[in-house]
Structure formats: C-alpha cells, structure tokens
Design a protein with these regions (language model features):
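Glycine-rich phosphate-binding loops of nucleotide-dependent enzymes
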Residues: 1-267
Length: 267
C-alpha cells in the first residue's frame, strides 16, 4: 500500500504562524495502572502542523487525548486552545471553541450505533440545528447529504442506522462530523484503525488537507508507519512522558523503536 505522505499533499517547509494552535503545559492525568498516566507532559502544536505521538499502546496516549478532549479529569497543568484556557471547559464548550476529536474507538466513543447516519453526523452539535427548542430535521437532512457526498460515505443513505455500514464507512461518519465543520485543532486518535486500504488513504488525505488549511493536529497511532508518513514532528510517549521529540524528516523506525520501549535515543 502506498501511504499518502505529508509531502504528497503539498506540505510547506514550516507551519503557518497565524491561526489557533494547541498548548499543553505540565499536564498530569491520574489513572488505574499508574498514579500518573500522563506525567508532566508539555507541548505546543502550531497552526498548519501535525504532531504525531508514537509509542506502545498503554503508555498514556489514550489518557492524554481524553484529557484534552474533556473526557477525563486533569490533576494539574493546563490546556490552551489559542488564547483560551479550556482545562476545565465542558466537552461542548471545547467543541464550540474549535476542538474536534476522532476517538480511538468509533463504536464506543464516536457513534451511537442505533442512530441514523444523519443523526450521527450532527451528534454533539444538535443545538446548531434547533429552532425554538425543536430540531430542524430538514436542515439536518440537507447537511447530512452534503457530508455524505463530500466524504464518500456508502451507501449514501442518511436514514440508515450506523450499525448497517461497514467499519470504514462508520469511520468516515466520524471523520465527516469532526472535520466537516469549522475547527482549529483536531485530535486524531487511531484514525484508521480497522478500516480498509481505500478508507485509510481517504482519511490520510483529509488529515493532510486540514493541516495544509492551517489546522493544528495531534495524531496518535499504534502504526509507526502512519505516524512517520503524516507527521511534521514526532514525540515518543513512554510511561506517561514524552521521552523524545524530533522532526519527522529526521526520524526513522530504527531511531524511534528503542524509545518506544524506554531505551535512550541517539539523535
């Protein structure tokens, strides 16, 4: 399979300097396996940049994403989206501030499987399709048809329940919902897990197009090749900490592999 790469969609040499990025400072998140699943993590993602996180699963990546998304409490530290502190903001407020989130488990976190495709496409944003407290079904249907066409969701029937679609098309619903609106920062956690080659290439192209449009993107993937192909910078996360951060153009599997199991990295 030929992966879409950061160069193949016209990446610039340096990220854009305008727009809204993400700044995480000294973030600590508690957990079950360790006292600190995320341990004093700090980073910045500028507009027009993809920061990829590599690492063996279970080293705090999921907890980091969930904390930024508002799904897990923060013990200490801060999260800023542009000039706005969203550390204690609700999920809806983060969403309205321009934070999008592709969760790692589409069926558990991303979709309501019994809901229709149309209802899943506006999940969490129903208040934008409401008039006097009543959902505007015509507006939802029109929006759903546009998103189905734009993101090539098959079959193109907004009234089907999400469970009736293939895994790849279920993932496209999530991607369409989170990337088909105005957003500043995207959290993409295992965005191509369990989907076919065609869907992988489509999702990669959408992520890179968003980066080129000036969005800041945090990518987490268990597929090291995916992280290497899409990222502008790569951080390795081990036992809740970033143990190395480097430009993706300088990174190799041979360099990153040892860091993923806690060994020192030669740079």
């Amino acid at each position: 399979m030929r992966l879409t790469t950061r160069e193949s969609v016209g990446a610039s040499a340096a990220p854009a300097s305008t727009g809204t990025g993400l700044v995480v400072s000294n973030l600590v998140v508690g957990g079950v396996r360790r006292t600190r699943e995320v341990d004093e993590v700090s980073f910045e993602i500028r507009p027009g940049e993809i920061l990829g996180i590599a690492g063996v699963e279970g080293n705090g990546q999921s907890e980091l994403i969930e904390a930024i998304a508002g799904l897990r409490p923060v013990a200490s530290g801060s999260i800023r989206l542009g000039s706005r502190d969203i550390t204690s903001a609700s999920v809806r407020d983060r969403h309205d501030a321009g934070l999008s989130h592709i969760p790692e488990d589409r069926q558990r976190r991303g979709l309501v499987m019994e809901y229709t495709v149309a209802d899943n496409l506006v999940l969490g944003a129903q208040h934008h399709f409401s008039r006097n407290g009543t959902l505007d079904r015509a507006a939802i249907a029109e929006y759903a048809q546009r998103q189905i066409a734009a993101f090539d969701i098959r079959p193109p029937n907004p009234l089907l329940p999400a469970r009736a679609l293939s895994g790849g098309n279920q993932q496209k619903i999530v991607v369409a919902r989170e990337m088909g609106r105005d957003f500043h920062v995207l959290l993409a956690s295992q965005p191509t897990r369990g989907v076919d080659v065609g869907a992988i290439e489509f999702i990669h192209a959408q992520i890179l197009a968003a980066r080129d449009a000036g969005r800041a993107i945090l990518l987490v993937s268990a597929e090291l090749n995916e992280v290497l192909s899409l990222s502008d910078r790569i951080a390795v996360m081990y036992r809740g900490r970033f143990v190395t951060v480097m430009p993706a153009a300088e990174a190799t599997e041979e360099q990153l592999g040892p860091a993923m199991i806690g060994a020192e990295v030669a740079v």
